[in-house]
Amino acid sequence: MPTYNERENLPVAVERLTALPVADLHVLVVDDNSPDGTGEVADKLAADLPNVVSVLHRTEKDGLGRAYIAGITKALDEGADVVIQMDADLSHPAEVIPAMLEKLETSGAGVVLGSRYVPGGSTADEWKWHRKALSAWANFYVNLILRLGVKDATAGFKAWEADTLRAIDVASIKSNGYSFQVEMNYRTVKKGIAIAEVPIRFEERTKGASKMTLKVQLESAAMPWKLLFGRAV
């Protein structure tokens, strides 16, 4: 779970995760030296729940992709069988994780996406029409170019088999920001590994600020073409 300025949301996210009926669940917080003190909040949570929560402190904020690579690498090194990616801003519903794990076990897929766009999935009522249109267009755009065959190509809520993460060589991924999610999916499809989806309701954050900058949007627009022509893999 990568964090940057999420001191208000992180304790709630951890509380929801630790309440799940999931055996051997471990929460790894990857904090990018948040100036609002998120790292200190994470350390307090780890001290209170030493067998459940741990913290990886990074010295600088250099992108969502780099934070995920650091966290996934640490999780694999520590012997995780399944790695779950999720945001700390409470937009991803933790209560769906058991269903994602069941789907991962029964479907034969190497990764399960928490999907806004399969039947039963939805986005927050607070989303304005233009944001919904942009999200729908982004998914259409990515699938048109890369033929991923999934409904939510830009999803950031995922449950991965450890072997799948090793197969796609996460550490070598070059993209950053939200395009990191697309590149992970693309590498999975190129390896012939199945992707499954379960419906979620994506909620709007109520605390803190979005990290979706113009730079991130431009990178996300260019990345599918780079992947298609082999310049990013």
Regions found by a protein language model. Name each.
Residues D31-E40, L90:
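A conserved acidic beta->alpha catalytic loop
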